[in-house]
Amino acid sequence: MEAISGMLPLIVAAPFLGALLPGLMIRAGRDTCTWFTILPTALALLMLVLHAPAVIAGEVFHFRLAWLPALGLNVNFMLDGLGLLFAGLILGIGLLIILYARFYLSREDPMGQFFTYLLLFQGAMVGIVLSDNILLLLIFWELTSLSSFLLIGYWNHLPEGRQGARMALAVTGMGGLAMIGGMLILGNIAGSYDISVILENKEAIQASEWYLTALVLILIGAFTKSAQFPFHFWLPHAMAAPTPVSAYLHSATMVKAGLFLMARLWPVLSGTPEWFYLVATTGLITMVIAAVIALFKDDLKGLLAFSTVSHLGLITMLLGFGTEAAAVVAVFHIINHASFKAALFMTAGIVDHETGTRDIKRLGGLRHLMPVTFVIAAITALSMAGVPPLNGFISKEMMLKETTYAVWAGNPWLMPALATLGALFSVAYSFRYIWHVFMGPVRDDYPKPPHDPGFGMWAGPALLAAIVVLIGVMPWLAEPFVAAVAASVTAAAPEVHLKLWHGVNAALFMSVAAILGGAALLAMHGGLEAVWQRAGPPAAKRIFDALVGGLTAGSRRLTDGLHDASATRYAAILAIATVGAGAIAWTTGEMGMPTREPLPITTLPMIGWVLLVGATATLVAFHRNRLLALVLIGVVGLVVSVQFVYFSAPDLAMTQLSVEVVTIVLLLLALNFLPQTCPQEPLGRKLRDGLLAGAGGLAVAGLAYAMMVRDFAMPSISAFHLENSYKGGGGTNVVNVILVDFRGFDTYGEIIVLGIAALVIFALTDAVIKGPGGRWLANWQSDRPDAGDRHPLMMVVATRVMMPMALLAGIYIFLRGHNEPGGGFIAGLVVAIALLMQYMASGFGWAYERQRVPYHTVIGLGVLVATATGIGAWFNGRPFLTSDFGYFRIPPMNEFELATAMAFDVGVFLAVVGAVMLALASLSSMNRRAGETVNVDPMDINPARAQDAQLEQEA
């Protein structure tokens, strides 16, 4: 039975919105900050609880909102039994962790920052478990990796914290990338990315040839997140985080995300031999290996970390069995593990907080000094060991029973034997947690005088310990909830019978053997530890570090070989790749005969071609002279502009010409500090470069000719633009309509890149001026003779007289651009050239005094205007940057057209002007620092004021 609930997105959004509060409320005090962190969590939990009765009764709630339907990405949420379980754990235990953290964190720890990270992580986890779209789930999945990175590395002053955070991000991030591929394959097989649809296509998915590929990729993501072998090593190193983080992320939330994913997709992926051998085997290996390592860990949190890995392996193994009964046990143990493990982590934090150490060898006898903590720790540790009458005993015995039905490669004894071995070591490390920390005589060398903490720290673990006892003594209370969750996992109605006594059976004997064997192992711990140390404990971190180091070294060698800051090297790589790709296509493909007649060769284009080739050849011959090479580049650009005019492309011609003027002026400023000539290249390098250049040029020429004399295989898009330019964009200048409407998003990206380039120029020049380079500039002597008159009077007068006309020309070009050649980009270049001429003619000091414009702001304003124009289309129900137009009449004027594209063009105009002028100001500042004098000619301003302006600009 399905129902619609508008609360589901609110449950997900509440923690994200609440993350804004702790940082603001910390000024009001730690208690206020804590309450404002509790508020969004409690609100989300309340909304979840309101749905609980209906969900337990079998109802499934949905919320659907189309977001990017063309990509299959929709904001779809689903609340069923499985989602209720995990969301309840995330929010319920989250409340206890927030209260615990209030008293755990010291006053030196930035509490507002901690709670912000915690709520971001909480929201991402709730998003995962309530998502009904695998693409949406992937977004939340990656958000958990990022937010957990911040939480694990919260104590960033500790090297262990930074290393643990990086390791967790690297491992889970790698798994996330693999999982993306698996999810895309899964959605492609099912024909939808909605989870509810995927769950209805079991037969199609398992019959697909891509089933195994999708399964492996998805399991890599799940195994890395849930720390399964061989990816288990990151979780213990994440214990460098504060204990509230460990208790939250590594008992009930982050490490359970992989289990959730396997449980969510269990109906369509399980039941095959591939699923059994991959999942059950991995879980069993993880369970045993981690349990063995945990026994020999002397760090309290390290012991609990490996115990967590072991229990996650246990649950993974149960899910891998692929039976409904095993799925029921997995669900039940998820609940039990979350309750006792969160409490154990918090008691470990209490011990560390009150004694000053987590080293088990420095502890002991704490039952007399910390009786409340001892009771809580004893109850929860005994539950972890599987001792009756606690909840851990029930799920452990049910697990052992399920292993007796599992046959691995024809062997019915292997899995029960190894599972019993894992349970035996689980008992041993659980008993060690109690015996070596709390039992024995009181010591006199504790780092701090131990005592029980205040109520705020032990209230949370005490509540969880009470749940451990309650479920253990009265397990039938949990039956309806476990049944609802198991029904969601199995897509069936499995029978659920939870009871403390299951009778005398094989599972009971296995359980007794585990308890007795675990006690015996603890008694022999000293001797076993000596053997363990001599054997050399496994150190997966060394393998991981070696792997990462090898990859880093290899990438560095590759980067050094390809990326050496040499434009020649980059051009060579591009030429080789282009020629190689073209050669492969030419030799393996098929090309039809020419279908078009080339245009006849006439005198004018021939002259242009000769000039172009001549200028290029001269440039190659005299390229060592930097100034001459720059002039020849300008000649090449001018000839290209004329060719554009000849071929009826006035927009391109004006743009090309304007760009040539701007770039030459800026390059002249940049070349001022370089030697007049380039170094002489060896003959071998010249021959190599000439060969590559010739091959690249011939390849491009051949491709261009082949395209010009043949019709396109697909219909040309030109007809669409010509037909829809006026109807869709309201303009007859097709080029401009393409820039501001059809391909407006490209233009939007280009102005952002242009702005970033200008800001980079500013940042680099500013760093040079304020750094050691500033002293070099102050002592720099030019190797070129100075001009007799830096600012000729004739040029000064001409530029000032032409300034208004140039600005009017820019405005005219801007306004006519939608229907005639022009537009915001060209107009911006024209206005920038007009301003450049003022700086060139009268000097920076004179121009800056009269044009105090913050060009950073101009760039930002241009991008904001363009962005606002694009967003405005949303309010009209259209995609981003879709323009609209209409006709208006204001008497006595004639009817005229207004288009929203004009506002976008304003943004382009501002961004272009700001970028050019900021680059000019940045480069000219280096010349002024190098000792260039401010213009003191009669038409100049007061020299003192000009000097002040110069000093202010340099400051």
Regions found by a protein language model. Give the residues of each.
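Transmembrane helix-loop-helix hairpins at membrane boundaries of multipass inner-membrane proteins
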Residues: 1-7, 20-116, 185-208, 233, ...
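Short aromatic-rich membrane-water interface segments that cap or initiate transmembrane helices
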Residues: 2-4, 66-85, 201-215, 402-416, ...
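Hydrophobic alpha-helical transmembrane segments in multi-pass integral membrane proteins
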Residues: 59-125, 260, 280, 571-572, ...
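Membrane-interfacial helical/loop segments at transmembrane boundaries in membrane proteins
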Residues: 61-71, 194-203, 395-406, 477-500, ...
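Alpha-helical transmembrane segments
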Residues: 88-89, 136-141, 172-173, 212-221, ...
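Hydrophobic transmembrane alpha-helices and their helix-loop junctions in integral membrane proteins
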Residues: 96-137, 146-452, 473, 584, ...
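Cytoplasmic/organellar membrane-interface segments at the starts of transmembrane helices
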Residues: 367-373, 426, 430-518, 527-558, ...
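Flexible extramembrane loops and terminal tails that flank transmembrane helices
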Residues: 603-609, 618, 673-807, 811-818, ...
